Amino acid sequence: MIFGKYINRYYLKHAPVLLLGLAALLTVDYIQLLIPQLYRLVINGVNLGQVVVNGETLPFTKEVLLQHICLPMIWIVVLMVIGRFLWRICFFGSAVRVAADLRERMFDHSRRLSQQYYQVNKVGNLMSLYTNDLDTIQECFGDGVLMFFDALTLGLLALYKMWTMDVRLTLLALIPALIMFAIGTQMSKVMTRRWEERQEAFSGLSDFAQENFSGIAVIKAFVKEYKELQAFRKLNKENEEINVTYTKIATLLEVLVTLFVESVVCIILGYGGYLVYQGRFNAGQLVEYIGYFEAIVWPIMAVSMLIEKTSRGRASLNRITELLDAPIDVADRPGVADLTDPKGGIEFRHLNFRYPDGEYDVLRDISFTIAPGESVGIVGKTGAGKTALVDLLLRTYNVPDGTLFVDGRDVNSLSIHSVRNACAYVPQDNFLFSDTIAHNIAFGVDDATPEDIERAASMADVRDNIVDFKDGYETVLGERGVTVSGGQKQRISIARALLKDAPILILDDSVSAVDTSTEKIILDNLKNSRAGRTTLLIAHRISTVERLDKIIFLNEGRVEAVGPHDQLYASCPEYRRMVDLQRLEDETKGGENA
């Protein structure tokens, strides 16, 4: 059994079912101890020709054998089968439900963690929590409860029977048990540490494999298959060594328990045989005593298994606890209100921001205003802080008080859900789900019709590509959309955002993978369909944003200039230099192609 703040509540929640299983277990354990008494009757009947039943001496006949031994044995077996089926359903069924509840709780907590958490913790490690560690918790909860109570009840009942038959023999038999308990306690601590190391090693191996499968195209392009194989072999070898070490300890524990069992058998046969020789035991009583000891062999063996499972369960619970204890950095403050009837006005006031654990501010004294319905471009060199602005607007990170306003209201006074719901977002990494194209486009709108989906695809200029696929909109995309080209992936992502028709549309470098003619079509469609709605377009190419209402030019985390393209070109030397360089690059490429 394992205990912890995230597991204890389930013992109470499933208490009725566990108590029913415990009652069935107690019944099975009690009637199981009637079997050694039947052994005694058979042995004494064969040796003495008579048996004592309920204080009455009866001749050992076929009728007595059938009525007082065979029929009771049949009933005992039937009741044991029914009881064991019942407690298995109760204990193991509860364990499955506990794992399901805990998995849901983990997922619910995970979705509320900030983006920073996922930048620090690798996907492979997180996935191992939902697979290996949860499986261990499930096994430990079901088997652990069973083994604990079975070892306790059957062991105590059998020891009581043994004690009433001969105190001295029972005390001698308990000496190895005390030694085993002391050894097992120390080994449990070692096994907990080793299991944690095992799970960490498996997480590293899983994460490495996941990254390689995701980046297989890059690996092949750079002909690094053998190098990655060697790295995998190294991690796999480390994982193997840790597993072998753990297996050695578990095997040693099992051997020690077996040694203990055999030691007790020697004591019973030696001293018990002496008691028979002295006439204090008859042969039937010795067999009965051995039968009681055989009944507690399973609890004794269960002790080693319980120690191992508890060690594993405790280690896995510690890892899961780290996830559930991870603080929710970005959360609503008490008393926040919803952003109702959003218009799309955005204002930054002297905002300074650095990423958690960052060494310097990526945004410095940022101030600008976007009126509702404006189309605004945000440009700047790589690392200028363009994406950081989007992260703050979407409340991916905490925003300093009084520095960011939506429709004139501080975002910290608004619920995160309502602010995000007022936005449609196309990120740099155009993530698509392993689902149909239709479901990907309709991801943000639950009641989208096929006509709505097709209209959004047309505005993103991806409709013709989709209908060319064999299954059209029902085409199932591979993981992260690998079955479509980069440009198609971007346009499907744009269609998804356009379908939401949010007051604020944010496109973060979202047309970089399409040609200039396709880009022009998309931008024209945006202009026509987004009239009166705010659009933010982050781009590297000036041609993407030069026709927008105004452009915000960022340079080294500061707002260098704000205004229409012509105004910035005339008044801002840095902006003009960037425009001229891009035009020169375009002319050079055009000359080469010619």
Language-model segments: which ranges?
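Juxtamembrane helix-loop junctions of ABC transporter transmembrane domains
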Residues: 23-24, 31-47, 75-123, 127, ...
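Helix-loop-helix
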Residues: 161-175, 245, 249-318, 324
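Residue-level recognition of transmembrane alpha-helices
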Residues: 21-22, 70-73, 77, 151, ...
